[in-house]
Design a protein with these regions (language model features):
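Aromatic-rich, lipid-facing transmembrane alpha helices and their immediate juxtamembrane interface loops
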Residues: 2-220
Length: 220
């Protein structure tokens, strides 16, 4: 039996995180549809409205890394799974802390209070976990193209940039998760942001490759 045909050993846990992940998206979409069709409905929720926005956002951002960790656990094994989690989160955290403090490598920006609390008062705790989760997925996608290692890593970093192309308008404009301090060319985003995403992502996936990559390894 091949690794892809085996039942997932943590199927129940995987389904729980998948349910939370999908449910948070469905709840958010339903809420946005309601407010678009009946904007006056927002007034009925009063002070609870921000929580109806924050809770599904937190559920989404916490369930995504949990889902990725459990999904890939049989492939990576416990030790490599933890190392990938720590490395991706650490690099993402450091890049964000440096970025919010200096304006490099992403450009001048700051996180709002929407995802409080924050690490050192600058970066929401869930953000580094998102770097880990999405970078594992993009490296896996790039690896499936069966290209040389250097091409695979560059593709993974480019996939991360494409993720940000879709993410930034939603999180920087649609939801007030962060604010740009400049008037950039793309939803206020400066061009340096994509360069910063590429470099940060490349550092993350290079570390993943050093730690064994994302390929399945048969264990005894």
């Amino acid at each position: 039996m091949t690794s892809s045909s085996r039942p997932h050993p943590h199927r129940s846990l995987l389904l729980v995180f998948l349910g939370v992940f999908a449910g948070s998206i469905a709840f958010s979409l339903a809420g946005m549809a309601l407010l678009r069709v009946a904007p006056a409905a927002a007034g009925r929720f009063g002070s609870l409205l921000p929580w109806f926005m924050k809770v599904p956002t937190w559920a989404y951002m916490l369930s995504l890394p949990a889902l990725v960790f459990v999904l890939y656990l049989p492939r990576f094994g416990g030790r490599r799974s933890v190392l990938l989690l720590l490395w991706g989160s650490f690099v993402g955290m450091m890049a964000e802390l440096i970025g919010t403090g200096t304006g490099y490598p992403f450009g001048p920006y700051a996180y709002t209070a929407f995802l409080d609390p924050k690490i050192l008062g600058h970066v929401p705790y869930v953000i580094p976990l998102s770097w880990y989760a999405v970078s594992v997925i993009t490296l896996d996608l790039a690896s499936r193209l069966r290209r040389p290692a250097a091409v695979r890593l560059v593709l993974a970093a480019l996939f991360m940039v494409l993720w940000d192309v879709a993410l930034d308008p939603a999180m920087g404009v649609g939801f007030p998760v962060w604010e740009w301090k400049v008037d950039g060319f793309f939803y206020s985003m400066p061009a340096i942001n994509w360069a910063g995403w590429f470099v940060t992502s490349l550092v993350i996936v290079l570390g993943y490759e050093y730690l064994g990559g994302v390929e399945f390894r048969e264990t005894t």
